[in-house]
Regions:
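Short, Lys/Arg-enriched N-terminal segments with co-localized hydrophobic residues
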Residues: 1-18
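Active-site entrance/lid segments in N-terminal catalytic domains of soluble metabolic enzymes
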Residues: 15-183
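Residue-level detector of alpha-helix initiation sites
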Residues: 40, 190-191
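Conserved active-site-proximal phosphate/metal-binding subdomains
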Residues: 163-185, 191-232
Length: 232
């Protein structure tokens, strides 16, 4: 059987709500974000994670704008909790995607693959929280200057696209923490409760998990891929 949606990477279930700047920013119970993954994170997975107390993200990168609109609407129907959309900024239909996100009442946007400077103010004017994914301390500084509300420090272990720096997650977390006071979320190679604890010790206030959530029943990843990964 495939893994259940939330806390699948924590050795023992959490018995109490964890309150910090990340949980307060998103209005969630646990500082656990499900990464927005191409072909993996549709409305079923995002809603399941949000219903379980984390923050589910729709992966807009692979979606036609109208497909994204459909997933947002279905996610609204499936959960009354916060969820967000991950948007790579380099996509050619970025203007249409941003307008759909605003029109459909999404309140949290994670941006990546580009400068957040152009869109952060526009999203804030519409009451949307903005989080930017960075691969270096230099980009973290630029993200804070752009006015984002939080940053994700994504190390080279991440299964998705990341930067050219090839900095590992455990090295990147303290480097980013040293240059910004923003709420910090760690990503890249985090799949257990022990890894989550290590990230918190190094200065992260939350974690973003991709691959582990891609293997859940709610993920839209190919079943052959799930089965292969689970039996490695």
């Amino acid at each position: 059987n495939f893994l259940s949606p939330l806390l699948v990477f924590i050795s023992k279930p959490l018995k109490k709500v964890i309150m910090n700047r990340v949980t307060s920013l998103f209005g969630i119970r646990y500082p656990i974000i499900q990464g927005g993954m191409v072909w993996c994170s549709g409305w079923r997975l995002a809603a399941a994670v949000s219903n379980a107390g984390g923050l589910g993200l729709l992966g807009a990168g692979s979606m036609h704008p109208e497909t994204l609109r459909e997933h947002i609407r279905k996610c609204h129907e499936a959960t009354h909790h916060a969820f967000g959309v991950n948007i790579p900024l380099m996509y050619p239909q970025i203007e249409e995607i941003m307008q759909i996100v605003a029109d459909e009442g999404v309140k949290i946007v994670f941006t990546s693959a580009g400068s957040p400077k152009k869109w952060t103010g526009w999203l804030h004017e519409r009451g949307i929280t903005v989080v930017h994914v960075v691969s270096s301390s230099r980009f973290a500084v630029k993200a804070e200057e752009a006015g984002v509300d939080a940053v994700v420090a994504e190390g080279f272990e991440a299964g998705g696209h990341n930067g050219r720096e090839e900095t590992t997650t455990l090295c990147l977390i303290p480097a980013v923490r040293a240059v910004t006071t923003l709420p910090l979320i760690a990503a890249g190679g985090i799949a257990t409760g022990e890894a989550m604890l290590a990230a918190r010790v190094l200065g992260a206030e939350g974690v973003q998990i991709g691959t582990r959530f891609a293997l859940t029943a709610e993920s839209s990843a190919n079943e052959v891929f799930k089965d292969y990964c689970l039996h490695l």
